[in-house]
Structure formats: structure tokens, C-alpha cells
């Protein structure tokens, strides 16, 4: 007996951590950036996976709302204006990105109620 155990395990094709977690965002790159960014002395194995999942979810949410805004304006391409409309019309995203200025985003159309013409009753 040479002590090799039962059947040698052959390593198959390597699988990225992103694909293991079912994500599109790069877990390995986020892990590297967390280590290099002096955020903490050590970074756990689950932290970059969690962060990648959160970032992917937020990106998908913003893109879906911006796509809806583009479709409402009969456009096929998302431009900064559509991002602005999507974010500012969503209460939670607006709160999250309240301190963010989107270049070429414009403003939300809004007319104060006191500036609107008075409605007169006709008898």
C-alpha cells in the first residue's frame, strides 16, 4: 500500500466564484479590490460574494427602471436622462442616491400647486 487513498481525484475545469454563486459581477475582482483598498486587515471568503450580489441586484434594479423610462419615451437606448428619471421617481433609490448628481440627467418635471391656474366653477 502506498497510502494514496481510493482513486485519484482528477481536477476538472476550474469554475469561477461568480459562476459558483450564480452571479454576473466578478467575485474575484471584488475580493482583490477589498484586499488592496485598506478597508480591513483581512477579508473573509463570503464578503466579496455578498458584496457582488448586492451590487448586481442594485444595478439590475436601476437598469430595469431606466429601461422602462426609455420605453415610456419611445427610445431604445438608455441615456443619463432615463437613469435620472428612474432613480428620482423611485422612493428608495432616491433616498440611497440623494447625494448623487447624474451628469446630463436634467430635473424632474414639477410645477408647484400654487402656480397652477385657479379652477373657477361655471354656473
From Swiss-Prot:
Residues 1-22 are annotated as: Disordered. GO terms for cellular component: nucleosome; nucleus. Transmembrane segments: none annotated. Monoubiquitination of Lys-119 gives a specific tag for epigenetic transcriptional repression. Phosphorylation of Ser-2 directly represses transcription. It holds the Pfam family Histone. The modification N-acetylserine is found at residue 2. InterPro entries: Histone-fold, Histone_H2A, Histone_H2A/H2B/H3, Histone_H2A_C, Histone_H2A_CS. There is a cross-link at residue 119 (Glycyl lysine isopeptide (Lys-Gly) (interchain with G-Cter in ubiquitin)). The modification N5-methylglutamine is found at residue 104. It is found in: Nucleus; Chromosome. SMART domains: H2A. Residues 1-18 have a biased composition (Basic residues). Keywords: Acetylation, Antibiotic, Antimicrobial, Chromosome, DNA-binding, Isopeptide bond, Methylation, Nucleosome core, Nucleus, Phosphoprotein, Ubl conjugation. Core component of nucleosome. Nucleosomes wrap and compact DNA into chromatin, limiting DNA accessibility to the cellular machineries which require DNA as a template. Histones thereby play a central role in transcription regulation, DNA repair, DNA replication and chromosomal stability. DNA accessibility is regulated via a complex set of post-translational modifications of histones, also called histone code, and nucleosome remodeling. Has antimicrobial activity against the Gram-positive bacterium M.luteus. This is Histone H2A. The lineage of its organism: Eukaryota, Metazoa, Ecdysozoa, Arthropoda, Crustacea.
Amino acid at each position: 500500500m502506498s497510502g494514496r487513498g481510493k482513486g485519484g481525484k482528477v481536477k476538472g475545469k476550474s469554475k469561477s466564484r461568480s459562476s459558483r454563486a450564480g452571479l454576473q459581477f466578478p467575485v474575484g475582482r471584488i475580493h482583490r479590490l477589498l484586499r488592496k483598498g485598506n478597508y480591513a486587515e483581512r477579508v473573509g471568503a463570503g464578503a466579496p460574494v455578498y458584496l457582488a450580489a448586492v451590487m448586481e441586484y442594485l444595478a439590475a434594479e436601476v437598469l430595469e427602471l431606466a429601461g422602462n423610462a426609455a420605453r415610456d419615451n419611445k427610445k431604445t437606448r438608455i441615456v443619463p436622462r432615463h437613469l435620472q428619471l428612474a432613480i428620482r421617481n423611485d422612493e428608495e433609490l432616491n433616498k440611497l442616491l440623494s447625494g448623487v448628481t447624474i451628469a446630463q440627467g436634467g430635473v424632474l418635471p414639477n410645477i408647484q400647486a400654487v402656480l397652477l391656474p385657479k379652477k373657477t366653477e361655471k354656473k
